[in-house]
């Protein structure tokens, strides 16, 4: 019996060892699920890795790898491949996978520029149900779906996202929050309603108020920011100031005591250079006053047509256009104010400084490199010019340390801390037109442009701005010479409100439906061009002679009740317009620089007198006056976001590259008169 008992005890003692060996042996043959770490964001790889893992896995693990591959493909810009893989997802998913699928569907919509579809999908997601890394993606999707348009929802999304980010991403988040706040008008800000417990949002809105009150006074702004940081020490923006406000705190005004003015004074461009010089010197000696941005105006008595100066390629145009392309040098409708001016949003003026030393350098007489060397030796504190595009390109290559207000802009803008770019550009005018037309509630614009590089540039600028504002496809139609237009009128063909889509620079893949995200193709050109009734706005870039044919041809083909509002650039405006022309243009809206729209009547009279009533040169004169204002506020334009000057060529603001943008006045022909556009 003893041996038997011993055997049983021995067997009992060995059993756990055997079981453990079997368990460990089983573990050795089972590969752990690595997809969880990637799903939770603790590990990352590219789409090729995820696709390989997907092929080698099965069941839930395979689905996880498939979801990860879709996420990576979207991030890599391979939207079409992501959609194809998305459509292969099985219907049966667990809760975690289902939430990831919905989030991915929204991210794909964003990649396809289907912002409304993305917002619909995001509305179905409860952020609290998501993992932390998914929450960061969710809020980023909400931010992207807003398209940068400032709103209370965008601010809340940015605030919710901030705690989920690393240090580098936090600065980007804070800068984006400030961008949204500073993009609002004061009227928009006044309509915001927040909850009592939204302390962070309240702090941001108080900072916005400091900015509204002091943005044109850098010293007051500095003090206001410092006080705000003391009052809201726990606000993310107080701990890490927006980059733009850091620049404000470091603000130092630029000196204009010694100015170098670089202009062509000989050759074909001399007439423009000397006119800008006249305007600049007049402002220096007399000073400037804020201009009324929008006024009611009516045409004065008709004047005799003035000869136009010879156009010169490369003058005051950012894309090698002639001056006519740049300034629309046909005379503008002569106008006088007939109603009270609107309140200025930025009462900024540049005082006279007759004692300031001004030296003119002729860029047509010697290489720019030599001129810049001489300017530096002469001790200039700021350079205004050059005017010609090729000279601006040379300026950038020189890497000059001087502060420069260039009177043109290069093909490819370079952000230099000491350079701002101020040009009268048809592209700027097109972008302003897109904003104006969008503000009037239009949804489907057609751009009528000349068959030229000018037309292509204007169309592209308009379409880019339109889509930036959240608009959809922009159509374009090109016209030929005046003789071709005349033949069209005689033949009774007219102009149909149809066109081909302007090809965006950023290509997008086809969309997905909201309810069942599956691949769909984008509409064809025929689907766009055959829907003539869709067009509700037509932006026309034409000379007075061309538009005199174009507008009747539109009515000839579509009838006077087509429902489309017609808009035109200042290229079509003319001071010699008689009553017949004004009646023919009934209802047409057109853009014009504020000075020639009646916003500064004394200066308009002064400018026209100086240039013998030549409206094209009057625009260049106004450019010279505004150049003086910009030179006197160079540091503010360069460093203070939102700083604005109501100038004679437009309401002037600077983008982050210090390209000066111009908001123009909009006028309308009404019963033979010129009035503000409604």
Curated annotation (Swiss-Prot):
Lipidation (N-palmitoyl cysteine): 27
Keywords: Cell outer membrane, Cell shape, Lipoprotein, Membrane, Palmitate, Peptidoglycan synthesis, Signal
Topology relative to the membrane: Lipid-anchor
Lipid addition sites, S-diacylglycerol cysteine: 27
UniProt keyword annotation of Membrane present: yes
Signal sequence bounds: 1-26
Protein origin, superkingdom: Bacteria
UniProt-listed HAMAP family: LpoA
Family (UniProt): Belongs to the LpoA family.
Name of this chain's protein: Penicillin-binding protein activator LpoA
Gene that encodes it: lpoA
């Amino acid at each position: 019996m003893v041996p038997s008992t011993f055997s049983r005890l021995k067997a009992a003692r060995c059993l756990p060892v055997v079981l453990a060996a079997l368990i460990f042996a089983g573990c050795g043959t089972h590969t752990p699920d690595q997809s969880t770490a990637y799903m939770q964001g603790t590990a990352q790889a590219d789409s090729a890795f995820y696709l390989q893992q997907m092929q080698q896995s099965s069941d839930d693990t395979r689905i996880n790898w498939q979801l990860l591959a879709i996420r990576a493909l979207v991030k890599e810009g391979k939207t079409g491949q992501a959609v194809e893989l998305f459509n292969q997802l099985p219907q049966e998913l667990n809760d975690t996978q289902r939430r990831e699928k919905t989030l991915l569907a929204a991210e794909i919509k964003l990649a396809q520029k289907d912002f409304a579809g993305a917002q619909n999908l995001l509305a179905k997601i409860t952020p609290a149900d998501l993992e932390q890394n998914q929450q960061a993606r969710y809020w980023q999707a909400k931010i992207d779906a807003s398209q940068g348009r400032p709103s209370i929802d965008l601010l809340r999304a940015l605030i919710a996202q901030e705690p989920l980010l690393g240090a580098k991403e936090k600065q980007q988040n804070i800068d984006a929050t400030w961008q949204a706040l500073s993009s609002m008008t004061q009227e928009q800000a006044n309509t915001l309603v927040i909850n009592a417990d939204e302390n962070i949002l309240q702090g941001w809105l108080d900072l916005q108020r400091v900015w509204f009150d002091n943005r044109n006074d850098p010293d007051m702004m500095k003090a206001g920011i410092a006080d705000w940081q003391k009052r809201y020490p726990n606000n993310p923006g107080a701990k890490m100031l927006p980059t733009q406000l850091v620049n404000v705190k470091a603000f130092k005004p630029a000196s204009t005591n010694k100015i170098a003015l670089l202009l062509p004074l000989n050759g074909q461009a001399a007439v423009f250079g000397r006119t800008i010089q006249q305007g600049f010197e007049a402002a220096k000696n007399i000073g400037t006053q804020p201009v009324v941005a929008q006024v009611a105006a009516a045409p004065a008595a008709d004047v005799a047509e003035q000869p136009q100066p010879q156009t010169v390629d490369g003058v005051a145009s950012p894309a090698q256009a002639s001056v006519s392309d740049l300034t629309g040098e046909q005379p503008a409708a002569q106008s006088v104010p007939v109603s009270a001016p609107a309140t200025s949003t930025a009462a900024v003026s540049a005082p006279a400084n007759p004692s300031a030393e001004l030296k003119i350098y002729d860029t047509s007489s010697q290489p720019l490199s030599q001129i810049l060397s001489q300017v530096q030796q002469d001790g200039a504190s700021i350079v205004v010019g050059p005017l010609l595009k090729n000279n601006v390109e040379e300026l950038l290559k020189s890497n000059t340390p001087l502060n420069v207000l260039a009177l043109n802009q290069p093909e490819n803008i370079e952000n230099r801390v000491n350079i701002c770019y101020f040009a009268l550009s048809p592209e700027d005018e097109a972008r302003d037109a897109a904003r104006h037309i969008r503000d009037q509630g239009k949804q489907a614009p057609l751009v009528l442009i000349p068959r030229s590089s000018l037309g292509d540039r204007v169309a592209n600028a308009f379409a880019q701005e339109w889509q930036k504002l959240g608009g959809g496809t922009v159509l374009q139609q090109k016209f030929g010479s005046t003789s071709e237009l005349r033949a069209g009128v005689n033949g009774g063909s007219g102009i149909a409100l149809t066109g081909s889509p302007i090809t965006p620079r950023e290509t997008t893949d086809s969309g997905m439906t909201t309810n069942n995200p599956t691949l769909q193709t984008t509409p064809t050109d025929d689907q766009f061009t055959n829907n003539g009734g869709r067009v509700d706005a037509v932006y026309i870039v034409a000379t007075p002679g061309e538009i005199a044919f174009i507008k009747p041809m539109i009515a000839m083909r579509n009838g006077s009740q087509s429902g489309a509002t017609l808009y035109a650039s200042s290229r079509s405006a003319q001071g010699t317009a008689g009553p017949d022309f004004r009646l023919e243009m009934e209802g047409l809206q057109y853009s014009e620089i504020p000075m020639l729209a009646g916003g500064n009547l004394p200066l308009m009279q002064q400018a026209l007198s100086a240039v013998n009533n030549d409206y094209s040169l009057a625009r260049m004169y106004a450019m010279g006056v505004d150049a003086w204002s910009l030179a006197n506020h160079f540091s503010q334009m360069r460093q203070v976001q939102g700083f604005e000057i109501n100038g004679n060529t437009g309401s002037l603001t600077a983008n982050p590259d210090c390209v000066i943008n111009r908001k123009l006045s909009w006028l309308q022909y009404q019963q033979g008169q010129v009035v503000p556009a409604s």
